[in-house]
A protein has these predicted regions:
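C-terminal ends of transmembrane helices
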Residues: 38-51, 98-108
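Cytoplasmic-side transmembrane-helix entry/capping segments in multi-pass membrane proteins
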Residues: 49-62, 83-89, 113-116
């Protein structure tokens, strides 16, 4: 079950960030990394986390990996960091990541938890990239910034706006 298309999880970044293939792929890969790493950490620490504080602990673990991703993106590409803006930080509260930590990683060994994160993260990344590519092609007539239809192309401006995510 694809987390975006079937479970409708993580819709905030899907609608807001997927206006270009580049932004969508970057956000998808960032989410994939955070999901795999947080699943691994939650699974490894599951026996030591008291039940009463497990959700807060999961959020702290997720926030740690989001901070790493945020700093890496900022160091590698300041333009990309500006384009993604606050949505990188919002990975912390993505219900997909917290849901997988609670439903799977907290009950399974590290290896399976990483595979679960990889599968769900790749599904999320694929969905985000697909929507981003379609929106960029229809809205700007380009793919990864490369013009596909020439200078005379009149794109559908709504497709590159956040509301355009509802049309794809």
């Amino acid at each position: 079950d694809n987390p975006v298309f079937v479970q409708t999880l993580g819709m905030c970044p899907v609608l807001a960030v997927s206006n270009t293939a580049r932004n969508a792929l970057a956000m998808g890969l960032a989410t994939l990394f955070v999901l795999c790493m947080s699943n691994a950490a939650v699974s490894a620490l599951r026996r030591f986390i008291p039940r009463e504080v497990r959700i807060a602990t999961y959020i702290l673990i997720i926030a740690t990996f989001v901070t790493v991703v945020d700093y890496v993106i900022q160091a590698v590409s300041l333009d990309l960091h500006r384009a993604l803006g606050a949505f990188i930080s919002l990975i912390v509260v993505n219900c997909l990541i917290l849901g997988r930590a609670e439903a799977f990683a907290s009950r399974n060994p590290v290896g399976l938890s990483i595979l679960d994160g990889l599968g769900n993260g790749m599904g999320f990344c694929l969905a985000l990239f697909s929507l981003g590519a379609v929106r960029e092609i229809l809205g700007a007539g380009s793919f990864f910034g490369i013009s596909l239809f020439g200078a005379s192309f009149q794109g559908w401006v709504v497709m590159i706006l956040p509301s355009g995510g509802f049309f794809t």
